[in-house]
Amino acid sequence: MKYAKKWISIDDQVDLLTRGKGLGCNNVDDLKRSLETIGYYRLSAYWFPYKTSSGDGKTVFREGTTFDEIMRTYEFDRRLRLLMFEAVARIEVFLRSRLAYFAAKEDGAFGYPDSARTKLSREYSAAKKSEQYIKHFANTYGDEHDLPPYWMIVECATMGTLELLFSKVSPSTRTAVASDLGVKVPVFKNWLSVLRVTRNACCHHSRVWNREWGVCPKIPNAWSWSGVANGRTFAVLSVIYHLLARIGDAAEPWRGELESLFEDFRDIGLDKVGVPSGWRDMTPWSRSE
């Protein structure tokens, strides 16, 4: 099928939304500014749940839907995404540290799995162009070593490479890292994929509200979840909170910010994030695991 939609001006976009589709708007200048700075297509993901079919088969906004309501949804998503990214960054730094520590202890400073060396070499080569500590190592020790030691290479490795490295190191190293984080190896291996996808979504400003995640977190049996979808953002938030609680004292302040966000935007509704009623009494939020 040929794509038929064509470019239209900002003024025409405003007219289409308000007159054509029935969006309530008290300030056209604000609507124009949002269309200019955020974009019609990006915003359409936030107004989609507010639309319905008209009698002639066209999609229009449900009666009473306002531009302010849609922008509150957008702002909720933006702030939730920032909270998630902050937490994933902490977890990623912890993972770099512990993976390097246990792998080097088990196999030596340069004991990389053969199946990971090609990818590590590519990232090492890229890092030599911009990272001073990598340049120093290459200039000083490059005649003897084609890669830097574990504790150095993990600092320039992508999340995808860390995920690969975890899957290839010795079983005892995988167990040590996963045990530090309070889960079994198969669960943490899945969670690494979840963290990578979440990190990428946050970095690229992708929507976390009303999202079905392509990689769904495995829920530990000990959590005893029943009837709760693990493909929604609530499941990802639960994984993040569990991991934060294992690595330091950031979990409760982060949770406080999350609960404040939920309260400030309670008119948005938490169903699109997958938050069930009574979630505070569920593991890991009850902290009873």
Model-identified regions with their sequence ranges:
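Extended intrinsically disordered or low-complexity regions, especially N/C-terminal cytosolic tails and loops
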Residues: 1-198, 209-289
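Acidic/aromatic/glycine-rich contiguous surface patches that form carbohydrate-binding/processing clefts
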Residues: 205
